[in-house]
């Protein structure tokens, strides 16, 4: 079937898309309408924890679909209880609210913090966030984000999100006042160019929060569920946050997100928060399958081996091509280029024949890598070899 036969004009345009339609996927590979295969190192922007069409997920979907799909959040259902128990047992948090997207989870975190401020800090409502941070695309989460240009895109913004600089504790300290209720950040800023917070900064934020009686919120929408080498990124900094949000990898490709909080922060009254599909058993059952797979013996050790392979491969490529190194945590990594030709490299990689390569360029001088956590050693080596060839071809 030719691309021109697809009625793509029925879709509202929100981004520029190449002239291809993906029709199937398996593991680290996608196939388009013309039968061309692509090695996928984007995986839905770090969503597909187990790759495309993982058998564990398909099995969970089929089994749950045969039992119960959507009873309403007004009633308990078994998969949501089971997933909540797993998440709280594996973290420092006591309670979970399930949502459908990272933006919705972060919106919930903002509401929970503001409610806590009303109850415990005389109506404090300001949440300090970071320049270049990314928290979602609702009006409140766009306002919380520090993405350049977003302050005017749908003006006026939601008020109450002063911006500090990541890894600059003094910039956070200077913004704290009587109306401050929390500080919120991503442990690794993904859209900003895969910039990890330092251990000193994360521990300093926890100390600042304790000194001023405010909350410490981690947005682990992209970093959670094994992506950075531990189940949750905050665990690598030896800090205990008050609130955490998850999405992307928790569902492995199914719309699922979570807002987690410590008991003393759970101040929502009945009716303060809700949603039609929150805790949907079909999605939660898949979440259980993803959780059980990545916490099974040997899984994270294998992912850590692929992390070393990716990091060492990118460093070798950087040295060979005169680039500026690599950075990241776990299987969320970036190759820093010496010029702004990342978009051209992404396009050339996709156009490779007979099989393409899917990469991501959040910045003009940077490539981001977000493979499935179970990517094979052979596919990792193949990507590194293809990338070397593409960079050479683009820079002829």
Swiss-Prot record:
Cofactors that this protein relies on: pyridoxal 5'-phosphate
Binding site for N(2)-acetyl-L-ornithine: 137
Catalyses which reaction(s): N(2)-acetyl-L-ornithine + 2-oxoglutarate = N-acetyl-L-glutamate 5-semialdehyde + L-glutamate
Modified residues (N6-(pyridoxal phosphate)lysine): 248
UniProt main location, coarse: cytoplasm
InterPro entries cross-referenced by the UniProt entry: AcOrn/SuccOrn_fam (IPR004636), Aminotrans_3 (IPR005814), Aminotrans_3_PPA_site (IPR049704), Class-III_PLP-dep_AT (IPR050103), PyrdxlP-dep_Trfase (IPR015424), PyrdxlP-dep_Trfase_major (IPR015421), PyrdxlP-dep_Trfase_small (IPR015422)
GO MF entry, a single one: N2-acetyl-L-ornithine:2-oxoglutarate 5-aminotransferase activity
EC number: 2.6.1.11
UniProt-recorded name of the protein: Acetylornithine aminotransferase 2
